[in-house]
């Protein structure tokens, strides 16, 4: 088991929290992480690229000249691919780039990046974020108290609406719920900030 410091939102230490070594203490597998990132980024592609083939280009319904007797090559349409202004052959069409890797690989990739955050001392565990009124200024102050001044991924429990409202206008903070935690967001953040309740939910899901 690995231990990390548990902080209050004012930055003071509130003891230690024990992490599940099977989730936060494994040897990171970079190959599996790479596969997970490529899969996520592929799923994010819009895939709306399209060109017009000869049937979609406007015009070209009439045969440009008769089949025989002109001495020229036979042509059936001025929208054939060899003509200027003609259709495109084998061009890109709308498609989905999404694919999936095995569930065990996805879980291993997630455990790997979580373990890497612990190794990098970039995991910040907070007992709770609690605000009487959801003000961005107050949340920014809390992050400052926790020495979180760069890009941060904030993992909050589902029912913490005041913290979500207070943090959503911060440009360097992305908020996810425990079930939405993913490899790409963790890798794109400098610090992973998670509440104690959300940490328990993540460990329960990955156990």
Swiss-Prot record:
GO terms for cellular component: ribonucleoprotein complex; ribosome. Residues 60-71 have a biased composition (Basic residues). It holds the Pfam family Ribosomal_L4. Residues 45-78 are annotated as: Disordered. GO terms for biological process: translation. GO terms for molecular function: rRNA binding; structural constituent of ribosome. Keywords: Ribonucleoprotein, Ribosomal protein, RNA-binding, rRNA-binding. It comes from the Bacteria. Belongs to the universal ribosomal protein uL4 family. One of the primary rRNA binding proteins, this protein initially binds near the 5'-end of the 23S rRNA. It is important during the early stages of 50S assembly. It makes multiple contacts with different domains of the 23S rRNA in the assembled 50S subunit and ribosome. Part of the 50S ribosomal subunit. HAMAP family: Ribosomal_uL4_B (MF_01328_B). This is Large ribosomal subunit protein uL4. It comes from Pediococcus pentosaceus (strain ATCC 25745 / CCUG 21536 / LMG 10740 / 183-1w). The gene is rplD.
